[in-house]
Amino acid sequence: MKRLSGWDAVLLYSETPNVHMHTLKVAVIELDSDRQEFGVDAFREVIAGRLHKLEPLGYQLVDVPLKFHHPMWREHCQVDLNYHIRPWRLRAPGGRRELDEAVGEIASTPLNRDHPLWEMYFVEGLANHRIAVVAKIHHALADGVASANMMARGMDLLPGPEVGRYVPDPAPTKRQLLSAAFIDHLRHLGRIPATIRYTTQGLGRVRRSSRKLSPALTMPFTPPPTFMNHRLTPERRFATATLALIDVKATAKLLGATINDMVLAMSTGALRTLLLRYDGKAEPLLASVPVSYDFSPERISGNRFTGMLVALPADSDDPLQRVRVCHENAVSAKESHQLLGPELISRWAAYWPPAGAEALFRWLSERDGQNKVLNLNISNVPGPRERGRVGAALVTEIYSVGPLTAGSGLNITVWSYVDQLNISVLTDGSTVQDPHEVTAGMIADFIEIRRAAGLSVELTVVESAMAQA
């Protein structure tokens, strides 16, 4: 048994009927032409043989009586793979758009807390001897880095326990839960002086710094109202696109930018197009960009990240200026978070009362209007650098996306995988007519950036990826 951290628990409390807090991982897998018999039962056997490597798949959420403390993970519960791993069939021959639509349907329902907080869907019907595995994992269980590490373990790209047998442990009693909660409360009280000291040290660094705080961080409650900011519907829609990583790296190098800057700039250009289309005007936006502070390859669970607020120059019609301003704003936001301390929010999250936090997030999710903190979430996660396998089958593509937050109907998540930069977009049912408007806008903006920089507008074709939708 282990206690959810305050930050893990906040991600649990923020889930409501219309704000689902699961993340999605999509792996496209190419079957050998002589191994077409690989089906959902064979896949269940593969996962069963690796459960000892993928410990979080056995975590069962256990609430503390009277909500006396954050919930706990029972670390080795009974796992019913027939429940967790489910078949799904596309109408053959399915392509990118058909798979995206299936992922949107899968994302539209929350996870059942009576079971470990994950599901996998074995999707058949893709063209070219391919299948897909869609993993739905609660954010309280793992952040982007932990999910990438767990996926790498599952594909044998990272070492885990070589020999092992999955053995369930007994469920705790109410007395054990209350006793552990009381002891942990005493420990948390003992950590308050260190948390206050961490906070005052951060504020002291801010006072002494010549750069101070970024404008986005000092005015965090003023994002403009837009088409994407409203009360969410429970429905989810999903879209993907792929760029060649070599093209993005070359463009970034020429412009003195990072891959993360390029992701922000492409997102800004696409959002500008959509703002003009849906709102008739384009104003600067405020994006929350997660920043991890624990990149340990051994970590496969938990949340060790903070969110920095980055202003996006969606009002600018100059693609190169958008890259430059995104770079400057990202640098400023990173410096601000380093000054304050990257663990500031997560440390104080330990003291959020469970019942009060759940009530607050229910109220926020039902409000009809803009999010008062941000317009959208944008993530860029470095994924595996080597091609993975599931059994003997080759993983050709990986896509990932995080959840939507209250009042924000758009999430853009980018994962790199070997030679690919894979874009994923999640929306609710009322933000855009088609989420592929966002992915198409990002590709179009990348082409405009390259054109303005004097680079070829002919993009490298990623042969291993599905054709664009």
UniProtKB/Swiss-Prot annotation:
Functional pathway: Glycerolipid metabolism; triacylglycerol biosynthesis
InterPro entries assigned to the protein according to its UniProt record, in alphabetical order: Acyl_transf_WS/DGAT (IPR014292), O-acyltransferase_WSD1-like (IPR045034), O-acyltransferase_WSD1_C (IPR009721), O-acyltransferase_WSD1_N (IPR004255)
Catalytic site: 139
Keyword set includes Acyltransferase: yes
Short name of one Pfam family: WS_DGAT_C
GO CC, alphabetical: plasma membrane
Enzyme Commission designation: 2.3.1.20
Function: Catalyzes the terminal and only committed step in triacylglycerol synthesis by using diacylglycerol and fatty acyl CoA as substrates. Required for storage lipid synthesis. Upon expression in E.coli functions weakly as a triacylglycerol synthase, making triacylglycerol (TG) from diolein and long-chain fatty acyl-CoA. Has very weak wax synthase activity, incorporating palmityl alcohol into wax esters in the presence of palmitoyl-CoA.
Annotated protein name in UniProt: Putative diacyglycerol O-acyltransferase Rv0221
UniProt organism field: Mycobacterium tuberculosis (strain ATCC 25618 / H37Rv)
